[in-house]
Amino acid sequence: MLFGAAGVGGVGGFSNGGATGGAGGAGGAGGLFGAGGEGGSGGSGNLTGGAGGAGGNAGTLATGDGGAGGTGGASRSGGFGGAGGAGGDAGMFFGSGGSGGAGGISRSVGDGAAGGAGGAPGLIGNGGNGGNGGASTGGGDGGPGGAGGTGVLIGNGGSGGTGATLGKAGIGGTGGVLLGLDGFTAPASTSPLHTLQQDVINMVNDPFQTLTGRPLIGNGANGTPGTGADGGAGGWLFGNGGNGGQGTIGGVNGGAGGAGGAGGILFGTGGTGGSGGPGATGLGGIGGAGGAALLFGSGGAGGSGGAGAVGGNGGAGGNAGALLGAAGAGGAGGAGAVGGNGGAGGNGGLFANGGAGGPGGFGSPAGAGGIGGAGGNGGLFGAGGTGGAGGAGGDAGLLSLGASGGAGGSGGSSLTAAGVVGGIGGAGGLLFGSGGAGGSGGFSNSGNGGAGGAGGDAGLLVGSGGAGGAGASATGAATGGDGGAGGKSGAFGLGGDGGAGGATGLSGAFHIGGKGGVGGSAVLIGNGGNGGNGGNSGNAGKSGGAPGPSGAGGAGGLLLGENGLNGLM
Protein backbone atom coordinates (compact mmCIF):
# COMPACT_ATOMS: atom_id res chain seq x y z
CA MET A 1 0.00 0.00 0.00
CA LEU A 2 2.82 2.43 0.80
CA PHE A 3 6.06 1.33 -0.88
CA GLY A 4 5.35 -1.61 -3.16
CA ALA A 5 5.53 -1.41 -6.92
CA ALA A 6 2.23 -2.06 -8.64
CA GLY A 7 1.43 -5.26 -10.47
CA VAL A 8 1.72 -5.81 -14.20
CA GLY A 9 -1.48 -6.05 -16.23
CA GLY A 10 -2.32 -9.43 -17.70
CA VAL A 11 -1.89 -10.33 -21.37
CA GLY A 12 -5.08 -10.39 -23.43
CA GLY A 13 -6.15 -13.74 -24.83
CA PHE A 14 -5.84 -14.59 -28.53
CA SER A 15 -8.92 -14.96 -30.71
CA ASN A 16 -9.14 -17.81 -33.19
CA GLY A 17 -12.69 -18.00 -34.53
CA GLY A 18 -13.84 -14.74 -32.96
CA ALA A 19 -13.21 -11.30 -34.27
CA THR A 20 -11.17 -9.47 -31.66
CA GLY A 21 -8.29 -10.45 -29.41
CA GLY A 22 -8.61 -9.74 -25.73
CA ALA A 23 -7.48 -6.39 -24.40
CA GLY A 24 -4.44 -6.32 -22.14
CA GLY A 25 -5.05 -5.55 -18.50
CA ALA A 26 -4.20 -2.14 -17.10
CA GLY A 27 -1.13 -1.86 -14.90
CA GLY A 28 -1.82 -1.34 -11.24
CA ALA A 29 -1.48 2.03 -9.53
CA GLY A 30 1.53 2.35 -7.24
CA GLY A 31 1.21 2.71 -3.49
CA LEU A 32 1.90 6.10 -1.94
CA PHE A 33 5.61 5.71 -2.77
CA GLY A 34 5.43 2.97 -5.43
CA ALA A 35 5.91 2.99 -9.19
CA GLY A 36 3.07 2.24 -11.60
CA GLY A 37 2.75 -1.18 -13.20
CA GLU A 38 3.12 -1.91 -16.90
CA GLY A 39 0.03 -2.49 -19.00
CA GLY A 40 -0.42 -5.94 -20.49
CA SER A 41 -0.06 -6.65 -24.21
CA GLY A 42 -3.22 -7.03 -26.28
CA GLY A 43 -3.97 -10.47 -27.66
CA SER A 44 -3.73 -11.21 -31.38
CA GLY A 45 -7.08 -11.40 -33.15
CA ASN A 46 -8.37 -13.23 -36.18
CA LEU A 47 -9.72 -9.89 -37.41
CA THR A 48 -8.83 -7.16 -34.91
CA GLY A 49 -6.02 -7.18 -32.36
CA GLY A 50 -6.76 -6.41 -28.74
CA ALA A 51 -5.78 -3.05 -27.32
CA GLY A 52 -2.76 -2.83 -25.04
CA GLY A 53 -3.47 -2.05 -21.41
CA ALA A 54 -2.76 1.39 -19.98
CA GLY A 55 0.24 1.80 -17.71
CA GLY A 56 -0.52 2.44 -14.06
CA ASN A 57 0.12 5.77 -12.37
CA ALA A 58 2.85 6.00 -9.76
CA GLY A 59 1.97 6.91 -6.18
CA THR A 60 1.55 10.57 -5.25
CA LEU A 61 4.86 10.73 -3.33
CA ALA A 62 6.64 8.13 -5.43
CA THR A 63 10.13 8.53 -6.80
CA GLY A 64 9.35 6.02 -9.53
CA ASP A 65 8.01 6.24 -13.05
CA GLY A 66 4.59 5.70 -14.47
CA GLY A 67 4.05 2.27 -15.99
CA ALA A 68 4.60 1.71 -19.69
CA GLY A 69 1.56 1.08 -21.86
CA GLY A 70 1.10 -2.39 -23.32
CA THR A 71 1.72 -3.22 -26.97
CA GLY A 72 -1.37 -3.59 -29.14
CA GLY A 73 -2.18 -7.03 -30.49
CA ALA A 74 -1.71 -7.96 -34.14
CA SER A 75 -4.50 -8.64 -36.62
CA ARG A 76 -3.97 -11.88 -38.51
CA SER A 77 -6.51 -11.80 -41.35
CA GLY A 78 -8.47 -8.84 -42.58
CA GLY A 79 -8.79 -6.33 -39.78
CA PHE A 80 -6.98 -3.73 -37.75
CA GLY A 81 -4.21 -3.92 -35.21
CA GLY A 82 -4.94 -3.11 -31.58
CA ALA A 83 -4.09 0.33 -30.22
CA GLY A 84 -1.10 0.70 -27.92
CA GLY A 85 -1.82 1.51 -24.29
CA ALA A 86 -1.14 4.95 -22.84
CA GLY A 87 1.79 5.34 -20.45
CA GLY A 88 1.04 6.05 -16.80
CA ASP A 89 1.80 9.31 -15.01
CA ALA A 90 4.69 9.67 -12.56
CA GLY A 91 4.36 10.84 -8.96
CA MET A 92 4.09 14.49 -7.96
CA PHE A 93 7.75 15.31 -7.35
CA PHE A 94 10.21 13.00 -9.14
CA GLY A 95 9.81 10.45 -11.89
CA SER A 96 9.27 10.15 -15.62
CA GLY A 97 6.05 9.38 -17.43
CA GLY A 98 5.59 5.89 -18.79
CA SER A 99 6.20 5.20 -22.46
CA GLY A 100 3.20 4.60 -24.68
CA GLY A 101 2.81 1.10 -26.09
CA ALA A 102 3.42 0.39 -29.76
CA GLY A 103 0.39 -0.06 -31.99
CA GLY A 104 -0.41 -3.52 -33.32
CA ILE A 105 0.27 -4.46 -36.93
CA SER A 106 -2.22 -5.61 -39.54
CA ARG A 107 -1.29 -8.48 -41.83
CA SER A 108 -3.94 -7.71 -44.45
CA VAL A 109 -5.78 -4.76 -45.99
CA GLY A 110 -6.59 -3.25 -42.60
CA ASP A 111 -4.68 -0.39 -41.04
CA GLY A 112 -2.02 -0.57 -38.37
CA ALA A 113 -3.00 0.86 -35.01
CA ALA A 114 -1.98 4.04 -33.26
CA GLY A 115 0.75 4.04 -30.64
CA GLY A 116 -0.16 5.01 -27.09
CA ALA A 117 0.51 8.45 -25.64
CA GLY A 118 3.41 8.95 -23.22
CA GLY A 119 2.62 9.73 -19.59
CA ALA A 120 3.18 12.95 -17.66
CA PRO A 121 6.27 13.29 -15.41
CA GLY A 122 6.64 14.74 -11.93
CA LEU A 123 8.20 18.13 -11.25
CA ILE A 124 11.56 16.59 -12.13
CA GLY A 125 11.45 13.97 -14.86
CA ASN A 126 10.94 13.43 -18.56
CA GLY A 127 7.64 13.07 -20.33
CA GLY A 128 7.07 9.57 -21.64
CA ASN A 129 7.80 8.83 -25.29
CA GLY A 130 4.83 8.10 -27.50
CA GLY A 131 4.56 4.58 -28.87
CA ASN A 132 5.35 3.81 -32.51
CA GLY A 133 2.43 3.24 -34.85
CA GLY A 134 1.78 -0.27 -36.11
CA ALA A 135 2.51 -1.22 -39.72
CA SER A 136 0.16 -2.69 -42.30
CA THR A 137 1.60 -5.34 -44.59
CA GLY A 138 -1.36 -5.80 -46.94
CA GLY A 139 -1.99 -2.38 -48.44
CA GLY A 140 -3.55 -0.53 -45.53
CA ASP A 141 -2.16 2.57 -43.87
CA GLY A 142 0.31 2.45 -41.03
CA GLY A 143 -0.81 3.69 -37.65
CA PRO A 144 0.12 7.12 -36.29
CA GLY A 145 2.60 7.48 -33.46
CA GLY A 146 1.49 8.41 -29.97
CA ALA A 147 2.02 11.86 -28.49
CA GLY A 148 4.89 12.45 -26.07
CA GLY A 149 4.31 13.64 -22.51
CA THR A 150 5.11 17.23 -21.52
CA GLY A 151 7.84 18.17 -19.03
CA VAL A 152 6.93 20.23 -15.95
CA LEU A 153 9.87 21.93 -14.19
CA ILE A 154 13.11 20.09 -15.05
CA GLY A 155 13.04 17.44 -17.73
CA ASN A 156 12.56 16.87 -21.42
CA GLY A 157 9.32 16.50 -23.25
CA GLY A 158 8.68 13.00 -24.52
CA SER A 159 9.31 12.38 -28.20
CA GLY A 160 6.34 11.60 -30.38
CA GLY A 161 6.13 8.03 -31.59
CA THR A 162 7.11 7.32 -35.18
CA GLY A 163 4.25 6.65 -37.57
CA ALA A 164 4.48 3.58 -39.78
CA THR A 165 4.29 4.04 -43.57
CA LEU A 166 1.62 6.68 -44.35
CA GLY A 167 1.02 7.13 -40.63
CA LYS A 168 1.83 10.48 -39.04
CA ALA A 169 4.38 10.89 -36.27
CA GLY A 170 3.00 11.71 -32.85
CA ILE A 171 3.32 15.22 -31.44
CA GLY A 172 6.30 15.63 -29.13
CA GLY A 173 5.96 17.10 -25.67
CA THR A 174 7.51 20.41 -24.59
CA GLY A 175 10.41 20.55 -22.14
CA GLY A 176 10.32 21.71 -18.53
CA VAL A 177 9.92 25.39 -17.65
CA LEU A 178 13.35 25.71 -15.97
CA LEU A 179 15.42 23.19 -17.93
CA GLY A 180 14.63 20.65 -20.58
CA LEU A 181 14.58 20.09 -24.32
CA ASP A 182 11.41 19.61 -26.31
CA GLY A 183 10.77 16.11 -27.58
CA PHE A 184 11.23 15.33 -31.25
CA THR A 185 8.30 16.50 -33.42
CA ALA A 186 7.16 18.98 -30.76
CA PRO A 187 5.29 21.98 -32.23
CA ALA A 188 7.08 25.31 -32.53
CA SER A 189 6.64 27.45 -29.45
CA THR A 190 5.00 30.88 -29.53
CA SER A 191 6.90 31.98 -26.40
CA PRO A 192 10.13 33.95 -27.05
CA LEU A 193 11.55 32.85 -23.68
CA HIS A 194 10.93 29.18 -24.42
CA THR A 195 12.42 29.54 -27.89
CA LEU A 196 15.53 31.19 -26.40
CA GLN A 197 15.83 28.39 -23.85
CA GLN A 198 15.70 25.77 -26.61
CA ASP A 199 18.29 27.60 -28.71
CA VAL A 200 20.73 27.78 -25.77
CA ILE A 201 20.32 24.08 -24.93
CA ASN A 202 20.85 23.12 -28.58
CA MET A 203 24.05 25.21 -28.72
CA VAL A 204 25.37 23.40 -25.65
CA ASN A 205 24.34 20.04 -27.09
CA ASP A 206 26.00 20.46 -30.50
CA PRO A 207 29.61 19.59 -29.52
CA PHE A 208 28.47 16.66 -27.37
CA GLN A 209 26.32 15.32 -30.20
CA THR A 210 29.16 15.72 -32.71
CA LEU A 211 31.87 14.13 -30.55
CA THR A 212 29.93 11.41 -28.74
CA GLY A 213 26.77 10.79 -30.75
CA ARG A 214 24.44 11.79 -27.92
CA PRO A 215 23.38 15.16 -26.48
CA LEU A 216 24.07 16.50 -23.02
CA ILE A 217 20.37 17.12 -22.41
CA GLY A 218 17.68 15.68 -24.65
CA ASN A 219 16.14 12.52 -25.99
CA GLY A 220 17.67 10.12 -28.45
CA ALA A 221 16.21 10.06 -31.95
CA ASN A 222 13.78 7.35 -32.96
CA GLY A 223 14.95 4.84 -35.55
CA THR A 224 13.41 5.23 -38.99
CA PRO A 225 10.55 2.75 -39.54
CA GLY A 226 11.17 0.03 -42.08
CA THR A 227 14.96 0.16 -41.63
CA GLY A 228 15.53 -1.65 -38.33
CA ALA A 229 17.68 1.29 -37.17
CA ASP A 230 18.45 1.53 -33.47
CA GLY A 231 17.09 4.35 -31.36
CA GLY A 232 19.57 6.95 -30.20
CA ALA A 233 20.80 7.18 -26.62
CA GLY A 234 19.35 9.79 -24.27
CA GLY A 235 21.39 12.74 -23.03
CA TRP A 236 24.50 12.36 -20.89
CA LEU A 237 22.67 14.12 -18.06
CA PHE A 238 19.05 13.22 -18.71
CA GLY A 239 16.83 12.12 -21.56
CA ASN A 240 14.85 9.17 -22.87
CA GLY A 241 16.31 6.72 -25.34
CA GLY A 242 14.78 6.74 -28.80
CA ASN A 243 12.47 3.97 -29.98
CA GLY A 244 13.95 1.42 -32.34
CA GLY A 245 12.68 1.38 -35.91
CA GLN A 246 10.54 -1.43 -37.28
CA GLY A 247 12.38 -4.06 -39.33
CA THR A 248 12.33 -4.14 -43.10
CA ILE A 249 9.17 -5.26 -44.89
CA GLY A 250 8.71 -7.02 -48.20
CA GLY A 251 11.47 -9.62 -48.29
CA VAL A 252 11.21 -13.37 -47.94
CA ASN A 253 12.31 -12.93 -44.33
CA GLY A 254 11.40 -9.94 -42.20
CA GLY A 255 14.14 -7.67 -40.91
CA ALA A 256 15.01 -7.39 -37.24
CA GLY A 257 13.64 -4.44 -35.31
CA GLY A 258 16.06 -1.86 -34.00
CA ALA A 259 17.09 -1.76 -30.36
CA GLY A 260 15.76 0.99 -28.14
CA GLY A 261 18.29 3.59 -27.07
CA ALA A 262 19.69 3.78 -23.54
CA GLY A 263 18.26 6.31 -21.12
CA GLY A 264 20.26 9.25 -19.78
CA ILE A 265 22.79 8.77 -17.00
CA LEU A 266 20.92 10.68 -14.28
CA PHE A 267 17.37 9.89 -15.29
CA GLY A 268 15.64 8.69 -18.40
CA THR A 269 13.66 5.78 -19.76
CA GLY A 270 15.11 3.31 -22.23
CA GLY A 271 13.55 3.35 -25.68
CA THR A 272 11.12 0.69 -26.83
CA GLY A 273 12.53 -1.90 -29.22
CA GLY A 274 11.24 -1.83 -32.77
CA SER A 275 8.93 -4.58 -33.95
CA GLY A 276 10.33 -7.18 -36.32
CA GLY A 277 9.33 -6.92 -39.95
CA PRO A 278 6.94 -9.53 -41.36
CA GLY A 279 8.32 -12.24 -43.62
CA ALA A 280 6.43 -12.80 -46.86
CA THR A 281 7.04 -16.56 -46.97
CA GLY A 282 9.89 -17.09 -44.52
CA LEU A 283 10.87 -16.01 -41.04
CA GLY A 284 9.42 -13.06 -39.21
CA GLY A 285 11.97 -10.55 -37.98
CA ILE A 286 13.18 -10.57 -34.38
CA GLY A 287 11.91 -7.73 -32.22
CA GLY A 288 14.47 -5.22 -31.03
CA ALA A 289 15.66 -5.22 -27.43
CA GLY A 290 14.40 -2.49 -25.13
CA GLY A 291 16.91 0.13 -24.07
CA ALA A 292 18.41 0.03 -20.58
CA ALA A 293 18.11 2.77 -17.99
CA LEU A 294 21.25 3.73 -16.04
CA LEU A 295 20.66 5.26 -12.57
CA PHE A 296 17.02 6.38 -12.32
CA GLY A 297 14.61 5.17 -14.94
CA SER A 298 12.74 2.25 -16.42
CA GLY A 299 13.96 -0.11 -19.09
CA GLY A 300 12.21 -0.06 -22.43
CA ALA A 301 9.88 -2.82 -23.56
CA GLY A 302 11.13 -5.29 -26.14
CA GLY A 303 9.68 -5.10 -29.62
CA SER A 304 7.21 -7.67 -30.92
CA GLY A 305 8.42 -10.33 -33.32
CA GLY A 306 7.28 -10.11 -36.92
CA ALA A 307 4.75 -12.47 -38.43
CA GLY A 308 5.86 -15.07 -40.96
CA ALA A 309 5.78 -18.75 -41.81
CA VAL A 310 7.73 -18.96 -38.55
CA GLY A 311 7.02 -16.01 -36.29
CA GLY A 312 9.94 -13.94 -35.09
CA ASN A 313 10.95 -13.97 -31.45
CA GLY A 314 10.12 -10.96 -29.29
CA GLY A 315 12.89 -8.69 -28.10
CA ALA A 316 14.19 -8.72 -24.54
CA GLY A 317 13.07 -6.00 -22.16
CA GLY A 318 15.59 -3.42 -21.04
CA ASN A 319 17.16 -3.50 -17.59
CA ALA A 320 15.93 -1.07 -14.95
CA GLY A 321 18.05 1.74 -13.58
CA ALA A 322 20.66 0.70 -11.04
CA LEU A 323 18.93 2.61 -8.21
CA LEU A 324 15.26 3.07 -9.11
CA GLY A 325 13.03 2.13 -12.00
CA ALA A 326 11.02 -0.73 -13.48
CA ALA A 327 12.46 -3.36 -15.79
CA GLY A 328 11.03 -3.55 -19.29
CA ALA A 329 8.70 -6.31 -20.40
CA GLY A 330 9.73 -8.72 -23.12
CA GLY A 331 8.13 -8.40 -26.54
CA ALA A 332 5.49 -10.79 -27.83
CA GLY A 333 6.43 -13.49 -30.31
CA GLY A 334 5.17 -13.11 -33.86
CA ALA A 335 2.34 -15.18 -35.31
CA GLY A 336 3.00 -17.89 -37.88
CA ALA A 337 2.49 -21.52 -38.77
CA VAL A 338 4.84 -21.86 -35.81
CA GLY A 339 4.61 -18.94 -33.42
CA GLY A 340 7.70 -17.08 -32.27
CA ASN A 341 8.89 -17.14 -28.67
CA GLY A 342 8.32 -14.20 -26.36
CA GLY A 343 11.23 -12.09 -25.22
CA ALA A 344 12.70 -12.28 -21.73
CA GLY A 345 11.86 -9.56 -19.24
CA GLY A 346 14.59 -7.17 -18.18
CA ASN A 347 16.41 -7.46 -14.87
CA GLY A 348 15.56 -5.18 -11.98
CA GLY A 349 17.89 -2.67 -10.38
CA LEU A 350 18.71 -2.40 -6.68
CA PHE A 351 15.10 -2.27 -5.49
CA ALA A 352 13.17 -3.06 -8.66
CA ASN A 353 11.31 -6.17 -9.71
CA GLY A 354 12.20 -8.10 -12.83
CA GLY A 355 10.22 -7.42 -15.99
CA ALA A 356 7.49 -9.74 -17.25
CA GLY A 357 8.34 -12.14 -20.05
CA GLY A 358 6.57 -11.61 -23.36
CA PRO A 359 3.81 -13.96 -24.55
CA GLY A 360 4.55 -16.50 -27.24
CA GLY A 361 3.17 -15.96 -30.72
CA PHE A 362 0.00 -17.56 -32.07
CA GLY A 363 0.52 -20.74 -34.11
CA SER A 364 -1.64 -21.92 -36.98
CA PRO A 365 -4.24 -24.66 -36.32
CA ALA A 366 -1.74 -27.33 -37.35
CA GLY A 367 1.27 -25.73 -35.69
CA ALA A 368 2.55 -24.90 -32.26
CA GLY A 369 2.35 -21.60 -30.47
CA GLY A 370 5.54 -19.97 -29.28
CA ILE A 371 6.89 -20.28 -25.74
CA GLY A 372 6.66 -17.24 -23.53
CA GLY A 373 9.75 -15.41 -22.39
CA ALA A 374 11.28 -15.86 -18.96
CA GLY A 375 10.58 -13.23 -16.35
CA GLY A 376 13.51 -11.03 -15.44
CA ASN A 377 15.39 -11.51 -12.20
CA GLY A 378 14.67 -9.07 -9.41
CA GLY A 379 17.28 -6.60 -8.25
CA LEU A 380 19.14 -7.04 -5.00
CA PHE A 381 15.94 -6.38 -3.02
CA GLY A 382 13.29 -6.97 -5.70
CA ALA A 383 10.89 -9.71 -6.72
CA GLY A 384 11.26 -11.79 -9.84
CA GLY A 385 9.21 -11.03 -12.94
CA THR A 386 6.32 -13.18 -14.14
CA GLY A 387 7.08 -15.49 -17.03
CA GLY A 388 5.17 -15.19 -20.28
CA ALA A 389 2.96 -18.09 -21.34
CA GLY A 390 5.13 -21.14 -20.68
CA GLY A 391 8.09 -19.05 -19.56
CA ALA A 392 9.92 -19.45 -16.26
CA GLY A 393 9.43 -16.90 -13.52
CA GLY A 394 12.42 -14.78 -12.56
CA ASP A 395 14.33 -15.27 -9.32
CA ALA A 396 13.95 -12.76 -6.51
CA GLY A 397 16.92 -10.60 -5.55
CA LEU A 398 19.66 -12.09 -3.39
CA LEU A 399 18.95 -9.84 -0.40
CA SER A 400 15.21 -9.41 -0.86
CA LEU A 401 13.35 -9.33 2.46
CA GLY A 402 10.31 -11.42 1.69
CA ALA A 403 9.95 -10.79 -2.03
CA SER A 404 8.86 -13.83 -3.99
CA GLY A 405 10.19 -15.41 -7.09
CA GLY A 406 8.09 -14.69 -10.16
CA ALA A 407 5.27 -17.01 -11.09
CA GLY A 408 5.82 -19.23 -14.10
CA GLY A 409 3.62 -18.44 -17.06
CA SER A 410 0.79 -20.71 -18.10
CA GLY A 411 1.62 -22.93 -21.05
CA GLY A 412 0.52 -21.79 -24.49
CA SER A 413 -2.58 -23.39 -26.00
CA SER A 414 -2.79 -25.23 -29.30
CA LEU A 415 -5.59 -26.52 -31.50
CA THR A 416 -3.92 -29.77 -32.61
CA ALA A 417 -0.44 -29.99 -31.09
CA ALA A 418 0.18 -30.77 -27.43
CA GLY A 419 -0.26 -27.94 -24.96
CA VAL A 420 2.90 -26.18 -23.83
CA VAL A 421 4.37 -27.04 -20.44
CA GLY A 422 3.79 -24.39 -17.79
CA GLY A 423 6.73 -22.31 -16.69
CA ILE A 424 8.78 -23.04 -13.57
CA GLY A 425 8.28 -20.68 -10.66
CA GLY A 426 11.21 -18.48 -9.76
CA ALA A 427 13.24 -19.01 -6.60
CA GLY A 428 12.89 -16.77 -3.55
CA GLY A 429 15.72 -14.58 -2.33
CA LEU A 430 18.95 -16.11 -1.06
CA LEU A 431 17.81 -16.03 2.59
CA PHE A 432 14.20 -14.80 2.60
CA GLY A 433 11.24 -15.08 0.28
CA SER A 434 8.83 -17.65 -1.08
CA GLY A 435 9.18 -19.45 -4.36
CA GLY A 436 6.93 -18.49 -7.24
CA ALA A 437 4.04 -20.70 -8.30
CA GLY A 438 4.48 -22.91 -11.33
CA GLY A 439 2.40 -22.11 -14.38
CA SER A 440 -0.56 -24.19 -15.49
CA GLY A 441 -0.17 -26.45 -18.49
CA GLY A 442 -1.47 -25.26 -21.83
CA PHE A 443 -4.79 -26.54 -23.20
CA SER A 444 -4.96 -28.49 -26.45
CA ASN A 445 -8.10 -29.04 -28.50
CA SER A 446 -7.05 -32.48 -29.75
CA GLY A 447 -3.52 -33.13 -28.43
CA ASN A 448 -2.31 -33.98 -24.94
CA GLY A 449 -2.69 -31.39 -22.23
CA GLY A 450 0.44 -29.57 -21.14
CA ALA A 451 2.11 -30.42 -17.84
CA GLY A 452 2.12 -27.90 -15.03
CA GLY A 453 5.35 -26.20 -14.08
CA ALA A 454 7.18 -26.91 -10.83
CA GLY A 455 6.94 -24.41 -8.00
CA GLY A 456 10.04 -22.45 -7.10
CA ASP A 457 12.12 -23.10 -3.99
CA ALA A 458 12.08 -20.62 -1.12
CA GLY A 459 15.02 -18.76 0.38
CA LEU A 460 17.35 -20.67 2.69
CA LEU A 461 16.03 -19.27 5.99
CA VAL A 462 12.39 -18.17 5.78
CA GLY A 463 9.84 -18.77 3.07
CA SER A 464 7.44 -21.29 1.61
CA GLY A 465 7.84 -23.26 -1.57
CA GLY A 466 5.75 -22.28 -4.56
CA ALA A 467 2.77 -24.39 -5.54
CA GLY A 468 3.08 -26.59 -8.60
CA GLY A 469 0.99 -25.71 -11.62
CA ALA A 470 -2.02 -27.78 -12.61
CA GLY A 471 -1.83 -30.05 -15.62
CA ALA A 472 -4.17 -29.10 -18.44
CA SER A 473 -7.18 -31.20 -19.27
CA ALA A 474 -7.43 -32.76 -22.70
CA THR A 475 -10.37 -33.43 -24.99
CA GLY A 476 -11.06 -36.48 -27.09
CA ALA A 477 -8.76 -39.45 -26.64
CA ALA A 478 -5.77 -37.44 -25.50
CA THR A 479 -4.07 -37.57 -22.11
CA GLY A 480 -4.26 -34.92 -19.43
CA GLY A 481 -1.09 -33.15 -18.40
CA ASP A 482 0.79 -33.99 -15.21
CA GLY A 483 0.70 -31.59 -12.30
CA GLY A 484 3.87 -29.77 -11.32
CA ALA A 485 5.82 -30.54 -8.16
CA GLY A 486 5.64 -28.16 -5.22
CA GLY A 487 8.72 -26.17 -4.27
CA LYS A 488 10.92 -26.77 -1.24
CA SER A 489 10.60 -24.46 1.75
CA GLY A 490 13.28 -22.58 3.63
CA ALA A 491 14.41 -23.61 7.11
CA PHE A 492 11.16 -22.09 8.41
CA GLY A 493 8.23 -22.42 6.05
CA LEU A 494 5.80 -24.70 4.28
CA GLY A 495 6.44 -26.94 1.32
CA GLY A 496 4.49 -26.04 -1.80
CA ASP A 497 1.47 -28.12 -2.80
CA GLY A 498 1.72 -30.27 -5.89
CA GLY A 499 -0.45 -29.38 -8.86
CA ALA A 500 -3.46 -31.46 -9.88
CA GLY A 501 -3.24 -33.69 -12.93
CA GLY A 502 -5.37 -32.83 -15.93
CA ALA A 503 -8.42 -34.86 -16.89
CA THR A 504 -8.84 -36.73 -20.15
CA GLY A 505 -11.66 -36.01 -22.58
CA LEU A 506 -15.18 -37.34 -22.39
CA SER A 507 -14.55 -39.83 -25.19
CA GLY A 508 -11.19 -40.93 -23.81
CA ALA A 509 -12.54 -43.86 -21.82
CA PHE A 510 -9.31 -45.84 -21.75
CA HIS A 511 -6.84 -43.03 -21.41
CA ILE A 512 -5.61 -42.14 -17.97
CA GLY A 513 -5.66 -38.73 -16.42
CA GLY A 514 -2.51 -36.80 -15.66
CA LYS A 515 -0.38 -37.51 -12.60
CA GLY A 516 -0.70 -35.32 -9.54
CA GLY A 517 2.41 -33.38 -8.60
CA VAL A 518 4.53 -34.29 -5.58
CA GLY A 519 4.27 -31.95 -2.61
CA GLY A 520 7.33 -29.96 -1.65
CA SER A 521 9.25 -30.83 1.48
CA ALA A 522 9.82 -28.67 4.55
CA VAL A 523 13.29 -28.36 6.13
CA LEU A 524 13.37 -27.62 9.88
CA ILE A 525 10.01 -26.25 11.02
CA GLY A 526 6.97 -26.49 8.78
CA ASN A 527 4.58 -28.87 7.11
CA GLY A 528 5.22 -30.60 3.84
CA GLY A 529 3.06 -29.67 0.88
CA ASN A 530 0.09 -31.80 -0.09
CA GLY A 531 0.35 -33.96 -3.17
CA GLY A 532 -1.77 -33.10 -6.17
CA ASN A 533 -4.85 -35.09 -7.15
CA GLY A 534 -4.67 -37.36 -10.16
CA GLY A 535 -6.68 -36.32 -13.20
CA ASN A 536 -10.01 -37.98 -13.94
CA SER A 537 -10.34 -40.41 -16.81
CA GLY A 538 -12.90 -39.95 -19.58
CA ASN A 539 -16.48 -39.06 -18.65
CA ALA A 540 -15.33 -37.98 -15.17
CA GLY A 541 -13.96 -41.44 -14.42
CA LYS A 542 -17.16 -43.33 -15.34
CA SER A 543 -16.14 -44.78 -18.71
CA GLY A 544 -13.68 -47.44 -17.71
CA GLY A 545 -10.46 -45.47 -17.86
CA ALA A 546 -8.09 -45.15 -14.92
CA PRO A 547 -7.58 -41.85 -13.12
CA GLY A 548 -4.07 -40.52 -13.00
CA PRO A 549 -1.79 -41.46 -10.09
CA SER A 550 -1.91 -39.02 -7.20
CA GLY A 551 1.10 -37.12 -5.97
CA ALA A 552 2.81 -38.00 -2.70
CA GLY A 553 2.78 -35.47 0.11
CA GLY A 554 6.03 -33.74 0.99
CA ALA A 555 8.04 -34.52 4.12
CA GLY A 556 7.53 -32.36 7.21
CA GLY A 557 10.30 -30.45 8.96
CA LEU A 558 13.01 -32.28 10.88
CA LEU A 559 12.21 -30.48 14.16
CA LEU A 560 8.51 -29.77 13.86
CA GLY A 561 5.96 -30.37 11.15
CA GLU A 562 3.59 -32.86 9.58
CA ASN A 563 4.02 -34.67 6.30
CA GLY A 564 1.78 -33.40 3.54
CA LEU A 565 -1.30 -35.39 2.57
CA ASN A 566 -1.17 -37.61 -0.47
CA GLY A 567 -3.37 -36.52 -3.33
CA LEU A 568 -6.61 -38.27 -4.23
CA MET A 569 -6.98 -40.55 -7.20
Where are each of the predicted segments found?
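Long, compositionally biased tandem-repeat segments
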Residues: 1-569
